[in-house]
């Protein structure tokens, strides 16, 4: 079982913690992680693109000129696709781009990125993370004490408003609950700060 240092929020070590090998100690599967990121990014697309077809463009109800005798090509409407200002053929319409990968694949992806953080020594497990009031200065001091200088994902066991508000104005820092941890967030942040209680919740779901 992988073993990592356990820290308190002052930045000093408080011993070690053993992580579940089936969650934090697997061989990362890069192709599955790639598929999971594609799925998440697809679901973020708005899909509100829209153009008008010939039935939706204003006008064009009258035949522009008679069928025969003018010498010109026959036309039925000034809103046909070949006309300037006419309707678009097979243009984009509003749609949802979201899709779901199988549950086992999604779980393998999140296990892979969590294991990668352990392998790269980019995971910091905290005994607890509590703040009496929401103060950005206090959160910045905690991150500095833990030598976190780049983008960091903070994972708490439950909703913690003080922590979320304190980290909100720090660039590159995101706070999520254990049940909301996802592949895209873990990959987009160099450091993973996770409380001991959150580790237990994640292991309970994924092990």
Swiss-Prot record:
Disulfide bonds: none annotated. GO terms for molecular function: rRNA binding; structural constituent of ribosome. Residues 60-71 have a biased composition (Basic residues). Signal peptide: none annotated. GO terms for cellular component: ribonucleoprotein complex; ribosome. Keywords: Ribonucleoprotein, Ribosomal protein, RNA-binding, rRNA-binding. GO terms for biological process: translation. It holds the Pfam family Ribosomal_L4. Residues 48-85 are annotated as: Disordered. Belongs to the universal ribosomal protein uL4 family. Part of the 50S ribosomal subunit. One of the primary rRNA binding proteins, this protein initially binds near the 5'-end of the 23S rRNA. It is important during the early stages of 50S assembly. It makes multiple contacts with different domains of the 23S rRNA in the assembled 50S subunit and ribosome. Forms part of the polypeptide exit tunnel. This is Large ribosomal subunit protein uL4. The lineage of its organism: Bacteria, Bacillati, Bacillota, Bacilli, Bacillales.
């Amino acid at each position: 079982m992988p073993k990592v240092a356990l820290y308190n929020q002052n930045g000093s070590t408080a011993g070690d913690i053993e992580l579940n090998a089936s969650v934090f100690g697997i061989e990362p599967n890069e192709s599955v992680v790639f598929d999971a990121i594609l799925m998440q990014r697809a679901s973020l697309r708005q899909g509100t693109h829209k153009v008008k077809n010939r039935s939706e463009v204003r006008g064009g109800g009258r035949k522009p000129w008679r069928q025969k005798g003018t010498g010109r090509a026959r036309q039925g409407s000034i809103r046909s696709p070949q006309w300037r200002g006419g309707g678009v053929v097979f243009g984009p319409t509003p749609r949802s781009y979201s899709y779901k990968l199988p549950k086992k694949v999604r779980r393998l992806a999140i296990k892979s990125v969590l294991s990668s953080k352990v392998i790269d020594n980019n995971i910091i497990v905290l005994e607890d993370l509590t703040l009496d009031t929401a103060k950005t200065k206090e959160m910045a001091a905690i991150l500095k004490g833990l030598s976190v200088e780049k983008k960091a994902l903070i994972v708490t066991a439950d909703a913690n408003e003080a922590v979320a508000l304190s980290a909100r104005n720090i660039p590159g820092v995101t706070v999520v609950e254990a049940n909301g941890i996802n592949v895209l967030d873990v990959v987009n942040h160099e450091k993973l700060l996770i409380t001991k209680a959150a580790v237990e919740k994640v292991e309970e779901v994924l092990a």
